[in-house]
Each structure stands twice: as structure tokens, then as C-alpha cells.
């Protein structure tokens, strides 16, 4: 969960880009691949689209909710602030919340298929 207007979110984006570049398309012991799904809690579609382009967010799964923190999906996941990152397993288990780049990278590397 992020927003184009959120400075800490924009600061995190280069790390997400690195994770996408490193793990996209790779097989894991317990998952077919790794996907990033970006949910933006936004005010203006133009700013959201511009931030995706400027930050180089090349993964295909982007969603914007213009109700921001009042959105159904933010409430469903208990988002109280952004950025908020969830690591969700293929069976829907939340394996991590707001993991650091280093911890997330370690978690993924440990699960790569040989």
C-alpha cells in the first residue's frame, strides 16, 4: 500500500523495483513465482500514473483506490499508515508485514527452488 503523494512510499519504491528485477519469473519451493501488487491510496489518477512511470514500477499489478484510507481494501488489510507492505503466501497466509528490504530478500532467497 502506497501513495504517489507519500514521500516514504516513494523512497521505498527503488527497493521494490530491485526485488521485482531479482525475483520476477523465478520459481520457489512453495510458490510458482513472485509478484508485487501495488495498491495506491490516491487522490488523483494523473499523479498515480505519473509516479508509476517516474519510479519505474514495471510490474503489471497496479490498483488505485480513490477513497484512500477509507477504501474497502485498506480496511480489509488493517492499513493504518502507508507505506505498508504485506508478504502473502500462495495460500493467503500473511508471512510478513513491513519487512525490510534485506529481510524480504533473505526470505525469498531461502525459498528459491534449486
What is the meaning of each model-derived region?
Residues 11-39, 110-111:
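Conserved helix-turn-beta segment immediately C-terminal to the redox Cys motif
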Residues 49-83, 90:
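Short, internal strand/loop/helix patches
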Amino acid at each position: 500500500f502506497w501513495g504517489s503523494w507519500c514521500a516514504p512510499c516513494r523512497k521505498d519504491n527503488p527497493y521494490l523495483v530491485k526485488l521485482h528485477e531479482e525475483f520476477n519469473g523465478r520459481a520457489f519451493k512453495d510458490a510458482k513465482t513472485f509478484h508485487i501488487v501495488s495498491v495506491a491510496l490516491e487522490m488523483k489518477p494523473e499523479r498515480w500514473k505519473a509516479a508509476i512511470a517516474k519510479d519505474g514500477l514495471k510490474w503489471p499489478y497496479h490498483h488505485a483506490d480513490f477513497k484512500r484510507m477509507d477504501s474497502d481494501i485498506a480496511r480489509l488489510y488493517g492499513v493504518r499508515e502507508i507505506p505498508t507492505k504485506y508478504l502473502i503466501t500462495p495460500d493467503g497466509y500473511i508471512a510478513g508485514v513491513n519487512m525490510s528490504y534485506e529481510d524480504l530478500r533473505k526470505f525469498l532467497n531461502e525459498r528459491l527452488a534449486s
